Amino acid sequence: MSITPSNQNITSLLKKESILNALERGIRLDGRKNSDYRPISVTLNYAKKAEGSALVKLGDTMVLAGVKLEEEEPFPDTPNQGNLVVNVELLPLAYETFEPGPPDENAIELARVVDRSLRDSKAVDLSKLVIIPGKKVWTAWVDVYVLDYGGNVLDACTLAAVAALYNTKLPKVEIEGDNVKIIKEEKTDVTPIAYPVVTVTVAKIGKYLVVDPSLDEESIADVKISFSYVQDGRIVGMQKSNFGSLSLQEVDVAESLARSASQKLFEELKKQINM
């Protein structure tokens, strides 16, 4: 049976009431505490043809990130740096309202936040992507595909991108003068990422703040705020979404929840990579 807009509004109201009733009892509908993540798994080298890849499952959300390297000329203003390009695609199979075609504003915003977290944190060492200074560099294309949308896709996208970059080994390069020979079959031990960065999203539902909102929680959230961290606890990015508001006190509480929850993401990365 199709759901009409009026029925959908009733459904949302009933859903919100159930979620709020659970939060009043100190628990969420799926049994988590407000500060808990859903089950997380990270699988490296999932796409064998990519230079590096990672599949991340976060509850019902599933995201695949792949890295491809292309030999290019550097930008004139950064002759001693390679390039980083992040794309996010919300595949039609991931959710019923996602449509084929060019990335929409949601995918573009996701890509922008992931890219900014990697750049502003200096986690990606662009100097490692230099082949010949001023002449040849690598462009690292980080393509992130949302395969199943089960809520809180941003945290999964950042985690997948970071894991895929750790899984990437630069190919061997032989240089004679201005001649460059790329030996893609032989990998070095050099990765383009220096240290990990994670993103933690907190949603405000009524008067409650919850980490890692599920799809149901996300659909009735008043506002979401996301924090990006490096391992030493520095905040390297922050993003607010939805039209609701947060008081300064709520931002402080949300940041405290996010900071604590970030350790769970770092622990999951440690299981797969050397940090």
Curated annotation (Swiss-Prot):
SUPFAM superfamilies membership: Ribonuclease PH domain 2-like, Ribosomal protein S5 domain 2-like
Molecular function terms, GO-annotated: mRNA 3'-UTR AU-rich region binding
Family: Belongs to the RNase PH family. Rrp42 subfamily.
Leader sequence residues: none
Database matches in NCBIfam families: PRK04282.1-1
GO BP term (any one): rRNA catabolic process
Protein name: Exosome complex component Rrp42
Subunit-level organization: Component of the archaeal exosome complex. Forms a hexameric ring-like arrangement composed of 3 Rrp41-Rrp42 heterodimers. The hexameric ring associates with a trimer of Rrp4 and/or Csl4 subunits.
CDD domains associated with the record: RNase_PH_archRRP42 (cd11365)
This protein's GO CC annotations: cytoplasmic exosome (RNase complex)
Plastid found in the keyword field: no
Database matches in Gene3D superfamilies: GHMP Kinase, N-terminal domain
Keywords: Cytoplasm, Exosome
Function: Non-catalytic component of the exosome, which is a complex involved in RNA degradation. Contributes to the structuring of the Rrp41 active site.
Protein's cellular compartments: Cytoplasm
